[in-house]
């Protein structure tokens, strides 16, 4: 409902209201693959206390003394391998922008809804897009962290950043945070359909399907983070929908960082062992990633595939994320329409 401005006094400040914003938020991306861009991005990411929960007195000497001097070049080279050279940006940025534009198209029947997108780290920032939506007249905003499974290091830090922006605003928009959807029927069906469609293009059948999720330190799980349990449930529902058994389907965890123990089994170690044990054909899907990014395109499609072949494997397939495809957008639209109820 658009506000009635007819009764305002002539000297009333110009304001817009009556709109509802939808803000899609993903992890983030560097602006380029060069050292400076990578260091700036990694600094913001690795100083987030939700991501690295160590005391700054312990972590910062390591971060600023070692990590930020060595890791930008290494990670920059990895990004170069999967960089969208046509648009000169990461594919995560490309897909997230596309998802926002497609969502706006899908919701065009809702005249008061405005759709935008942001990144937790890097640009466009959450704060800048909340401000932009407010300037467009959005006095209510649905904040959608694009993570099917909840984790403090992903979903919670998006929410933190949004509420941090609200602290600085005189006229705060009402904010509705979107919960996880790890066991949503439409989501599971979209994953299963993606697996079936991709495997149908192969001239071989995998002996094992791995569902590889981003890992978190084991200590986070022990402190009450529900992420591990939600990943396991997503995996179980996907396995049951595909009609697979525990003998040919596994949930694994990737992307560990630092000396701590992380959720297991580790994807890289599992891929090596499967090949060494005589498994010749495997496929990997990343159900926890809404869009393909460094962790899927380089870590799985490149590194894991290479490791599998180096250790005796013969056939390796990486199943793309749902990205901005029709099935993936159906999932996101269902969640958004559900969360808009009562506001439109």
UniProtKB/Swiss-Prot annotation:
Keywords: Cytoplasm, Heme biosynthesis, Iron, Lyase, Metal-binding, Porphyrin biosynthesis. InterPro entries: Ferrochelatase (IPR001015), Ferrochelatase_AS (IPR019772), Ferrochelatase_C (IPR033644), Ferrochelatase_N (IPR033659). It comes from the Bacteria. Fe cation binds at residues 214, 295. It is found in: Cytoplasm. One of its GO terms (biological process) is heme biosynthetic process. Pathway: Porphyrin-containing compound metabolism; protoheme biosynthesis; protoheme from protoporphyrin-IX: step 1/1. Its EC number is 4.98.1.1. It catalyses: heme b + 2 H(+) = protoporphyrin IX + Fe(2+). GO terms for cellular component: cytoplasm. Catalyzes the ferrous insertion into protoporphyrin IX. This is Ferrochelatase.
């Amino acid at each position: 409902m658009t506000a009635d401005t007819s009764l305002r006094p002539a000297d009333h400040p110009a304001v817009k209201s009556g709109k509802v914003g939808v803000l899609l938020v993903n992890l983030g991306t560097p602006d380029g693959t060069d050292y400076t861009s990578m260091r700036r991005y990694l600094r913001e990411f690795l100083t987030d206390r939700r991501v690295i929960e160590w005391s700054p007195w312990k972590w910062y000497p390591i971060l600023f003394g070692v990590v930020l001097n060595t890791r930008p070049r290494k990670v920059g080279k990895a990004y170069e391998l999967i960089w969208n050279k046509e648009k000169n940006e990461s594919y995560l940025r490309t897909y997230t922008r596309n998802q926002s534009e497609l969502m706006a198209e899908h919701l065009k029947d809702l005249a008061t809804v405005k759709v935008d997108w942001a990144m937790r780290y890097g640009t466009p920032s959450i704060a800048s897009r909340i401000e932009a939506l407010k300037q467009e007249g959005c006095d209510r905003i649905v904040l959608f962290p694009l993570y099917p499974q909840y984790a403090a290091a992903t979903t919670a830090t998006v929410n933190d950043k949004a509420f941090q922006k609200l602290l600085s605003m005189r006229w705060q928009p009402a904010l509705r945070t979107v919960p996880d959807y790890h066991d949503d029927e439409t989501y599971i069906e979209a994953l299963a359909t993606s697996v079936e469609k991709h495997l149908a293009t192969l001239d071989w059948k995998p002996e094992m399907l791995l569902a590889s999720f981003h890992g978190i330190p084991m200590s986070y799980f022990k402190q009450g983070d529900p992420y591990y349990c939600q990943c396991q449930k997503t995996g179980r529902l996907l396995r049951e929908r595909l009609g697979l058994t525990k003998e040919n389907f596994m949930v694994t965890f990737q992307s560990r960082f630092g000396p701590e123990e992380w959720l297991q089994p580790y994807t890289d170690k599992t891929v090596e062992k499967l090949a060494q044990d005589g498994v010749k054909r495997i496929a990997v899907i990343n159900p926890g990633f809404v869009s393909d990014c460094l962790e899927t395109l380089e870590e799985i499609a490149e590194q894991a595939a290479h490791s599998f072949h180096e250790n005796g494997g013969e056939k390796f397939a990486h199943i793309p994320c749902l990205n901005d495809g029709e099935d993936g957008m159906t999932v996101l639209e269902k969640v958004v329409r559900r969360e808009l109820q009562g506001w439109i």
